[in-house]
A protein has these predicted regions:
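A short loop-to-beta-strand scaffold at the N-terminal edge of the catalytic core in hydrolase folds
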Residues: 22-34
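Catalytic active-site module of serine/aspartate enzymes centered on a nucleophile-bearing elbow/loop
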Residues: 294-298, 302-338
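Gly/Pro-rich cap/lid or specificity-loop segments adjacent to the active site
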Residues: 22, 50-135, 142, 146-168, ...
């Protein structure tokens, strides 16, 4: 979490869906490429659950469909990820366990302020993203339907299913079982809880067949245990526990129909999406299964479902894991931007 090559957009005090105020809110973001005179080459990339603007760089390049030589790419960090306003960096009264509940709606309201006020952009050519980033693309398209021309969510959903919610409760419980967690009021990181969080999460990130066929060896792990230790270390070394839980709650409450605009009428929210849409689920994704996207695709007017078959599961989209997925992703981008 030490990549300082980014910009800050000051939002001031933000009233949240919950009614609480997020004080002195800020978004951390990074741009790539140049905004053209027509301002019609904008591609927005939100961040995924353990993502950052830096990790989003794996989804574009000069030889990729999203190309900084052609597009003005805005990579925006999720509230709670340690770069944008988060429990770890909030004002003292909202630091740590005192951080308010954040929804997807809140995130996209803030991102809209950045895009419109900082860059005076009125149209976004494409919003794309993996996992929670894809969830944000749906939210953008429902919240600001006249502004978003195309979305490409992959391994994501417009509403978190009950099964997905239960999965998240499991990793949450593993973290919070550490006595050092202390209801979020810890002086030192809850190491045991963070390790347990990573260890439990690893079982969901990949499919059963991924382990059965020992695909983890392609990642350089000789054994399952070595993979699990790596997941432990990643969460201990890179993530604040309160930050993880803030984003987890945002994920659990993901529903594009939250708020006064739709009053939890999910189908109406889907029907109101005007953006040209391609959804790419993975056949073996354990928490964003294709069935959820099949339902969504029935109600989004201009939508195509392109299910990708891979035993990598949810992590098929992690840059570098599956070259075939990268090819499918770039084709979808080109089809949406043609």
């Amino acid at each position: 979490m030490n990549d300082n090559d980014y910009d800050i957009f000051e939002l001031g005090n933000v009233k949240l869906v919950s009614g609480e105020i997020l004080y002195s809110a800020k978004l951390a973001y990074k741009t790539y490429g140049l905004l053209n005179k027509k301002k019609d080459n904008v591609v927005l990339l939100p961040t995924f659950y353990t993502g950052t603007h830096k990790r989003n760089e794996g989804f574009f390049g000069i030889n990729r469909a999203i190309n900084p030589n052609k597009h003005f790419i805005i990579s925006i960090n999720l509230l709670g990820n340690g770069f944008s306003t988060s429990p770890s960096n909030a004002k003292n009264t909202q630091k740590g366990a005192n951080f308010p509940e954040i929804t997807m709606w809140d995130n996209i309201w803030c991102q809209h302020k950045l895009v419109t006020q900082k860059f005076n952009i009125s149209k976004i050519a494409l919003i794309a993203g993996w996992s929670m980033a894809g969830c944000q693309s749906y939210q953008w398209a429902a919240q600001y339907p006249d502004m978003v021309e195309a979305i490409l969510p992959f391994c994501a959903s417009a509403k978190t299913s009950e099964h997905n919610f239960v999965f998240l409760e499991g990793v949450k419980a593993a973290l919070c079982a550490d006595p050092a967690w202390n209801n979020g009021s810890y002086d030192a990181p809850p190491i045991r809880g963070l390790k347990a969080f990573g260890r439990v999460y690893a079982g969901w990130a990949f499919s059963q067949s991924f382990f059965r066929e020992k695909i983890y060896k392609n990642l350089g792990f000789a054994t399952v245990e070595s993979l699990l230790v790596d997941w432990e270390n990643d969460h201990v070394n890179n993530w604040d526990a309160n930050n993880l839980l803030t984003k987890l709650i945002t994920w659990q409450k993901n529903d594009i129909s939250i708020g006064k605009k739709y009053n939890r009428n999910f189908i109406q929210a889907l029907q109101n999406i005007k953006a040209k849409t391609i959804i790419i689920p993975c056949t073996h994704d354990l928490y964003f299964p294709p069935e959820d996207n099949e339902f969504e695709a029935r109600y989004i007017k201009n939508c195509e479902l392109r299910t990708y078959n891979s035993i990598w599961g949810h992590c098929v989209a992690n840059p570098g894991n599956d070259k075939g997925f990268e090819t499918a992703l770039d084709k979808a981008v080109n089809d949406l931007l043609e």
